[in-house]
């Protein structure tokens, strides 16, 4: 120890010895501070080289001579590598990473990768102090960075790619389902808003709902047939035709609704009345028909099918013949009734009941308000009372001349109507069927209350009648029901359906589908 200079600073000198030919090579192990490596806890440590990459650098061993050898194989392989610029790397054991296991299998595992280029521009030395106080300096040959190895299994490159694709698939599915939920929520909100608006505008929503809930009695279920789909398709097609005609009216209606919404605050009582009129006019086009046109009964109303429009002239002639036969049967008992009229006043009750059927045509033509004559006891009844209680059209012995004139007028009207029916085409004749039925006197006239009492019936729903229709041409159940209407048969709609079902079961006709409709027919 020596003091140099006058400044009074103390300087300590050490002797450092560097070996010329070191027998050992020293390497540096660098750990990351974040790993918190504590060497004092290491009881056991083992290091070995990781030679797993040896297969990558290993060449295929081919025999140089003998079987399987190739002439100048090495030279050709080298020329190929030079041509494509392929540089082979030699497998050096010193360059392979270290595997460090601490405290056996239960401990941690580290992997040390060699850091290249450390000794190119700088030199690192390791100093060790000897017993005499001098230091020996050994140069560092290699530098290794050690990182802890994860215990859990990691994915390879291919497995990672598959998992990435699966992740994208899951995320896409999640986004699609989220969009669907949002759309459903928006759709529900829109429906709620539309429902509230319909209830505000004169209860239109309720009316439309009722219209959709209303279903006509399904005839096919009772008849055990399979033509329900055809009927539904017909109804849908006809309902589609109706809005096509009303397209301009709907456009104008939307404009009116918009204007009404804009001026809701300044609305008066008259605005709602206008809306109701629009709705009523749009509800059904039948209200806009000509006032002079005769409307059929409820059973006859409804859309006319294609089969009804395409009825042949033979069918119309057959119906005409049936009507004439019925009229002749009605007119046959007239001479017997005339003999009964010549009897005394005691038989007024029988006269009124029997002659009421004969004079039904004349009474239906000239009198609107008519009631069926109530029966009275023979003892207490008198001429005046029976005449007063009977219908205005019932003849009595005193009114023989008037009844004959009424019959003549009725017969003339029937003949004139027959001439017009024969001249009119088949399509018009179907619509005008209601007129001749009332004038022929086969059904009692309807009073003002709207209730009609069914008579004996023009057409009887029998097996022979159904057989005749089915042998003529194939017909659907709708067509058969239109042939046997309640007005003609005198039966209710349920009774006609049940009777027709039983008749079809007995006949067991052949079936065929034409234009998605089940048709029944019988072979002669």
From Swiss-Prot:
Compositional bias segments (type: Basic and acidic residues): 290-307
UniProt-listed GO biological process terms: negative regulation of protein binding; positive regulation of transcription by RNA polymerase II; positive regulation of transcription elongation by RNA polymerase II; transcription initiation at RNA polymerase II promoter
Localization (cell): Nucleus
UniProt keyword Oxidoreductase present: no
Amino acid composition bias (Acidic residues), ranges on this chain: 262-289, 308-327, 347-358
MF-aspect GO terms: DNA binding; promoter-specific chromatin binding; RNA polymerase II general transcription initiation factor activity; TFIIF-class transcription factor complex binding; transferase activity
Compositional bias segments (type: Basic residues): 242-257, 368-378
Composition skew (Low complexity), residue ranges: 381-397
Entry similarity comment: Belongs to the TFIIF alpha subunit family.
Subunit organization: Heterodimer of an alpha and a beta subunit.
PANTHER family in the cross-refs: GENERAL TRANSCRIPTION FACTOR IIF SUBUNIT 1 (PTHR13011:SF0), TFIIF-ALPHA (PTHR13011)
Name by which UniProt lists this protein: General transcription factor IIF subunit 1
Organismal lineage: Eukaryota, Metazoa, Chordata, Craniata, Vertebrata
Gene designation per UniProt: gtf2f1
